[in-house]
Regions:
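Phosphate-coordination/substrate-recognition cap region in phosphate-metabolizing enzymes
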Residues: 1-26, 95
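Conserved anionic group-binding/transfer micro-motifs
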Residues: 17, 48-49
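Short glycine/proline- and acidic residue-enriched helix-loop micro-motifs
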Residues: 25-47
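Active-site catalytic microenvironments for nucleophilic, acid-base chemistry
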Residues: 58, 62, 83-87
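Generic beta-sheet signal
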Residues: 59, 64-75
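Short, solvent-exposed aromatic-acidic interface loops
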Residues: 116-119
Length: 119
């Protein structure tokens, strides 16, 4: 499932983000609660999570049983974990996201996700 759309930041390096958009770069990476996606023509985090959950629900409606592998990116996955754990979606820190190739296993029962194990 797709990552958050980062608007004018798409394709930029971290250095370029901080050079061209220092205030929003600082907010996103160090104070995400004050990040204003509209300032960089990006998808806001709430909309990204809603889009992700819509995709997950579509998959669950098609595949009523068995195992499902979902491959996605760190930011949207971190927001999903916060959603499952009833934490704020803004409790993310880009500097501590799961690494490439990391995974978590969830079960889904009675309309709820439960983390089973991680690597």
């Amino acid at each position: 499932l797709n990552e958050v759309y980062f608007g004018v930041w798409q394709g930029l390096t971290y250095e370029e983000v901080f050079l061209k958009y220092p205030e929003e770069g600082n907010n996103y990476f160090y104070d995400v609660k004050n990040y204003k996606a509209e300032n960089v023509e990006a998808e806001n985090l709430k909309d990204a999570l809603e889009r992700f959950l819509k995709g997950i629900n579509k998959i669950l409606n098609i595949h009523k049983s068995g195992n499902i592998l979902v491959v996605t990116h760190g930011t949207v996955f971190e927001m999903f974990i916060n959603y499952v754990e009833n934490n704020s979606i803004f409790d993310i820190d880009e500097r501590t996201l799961m690494g490439n190739g990391d995974y978590k296993v969830f079960s889904y029962k009675d309309g709820k996700f439960q983390e089973e194990r991680d690597k």
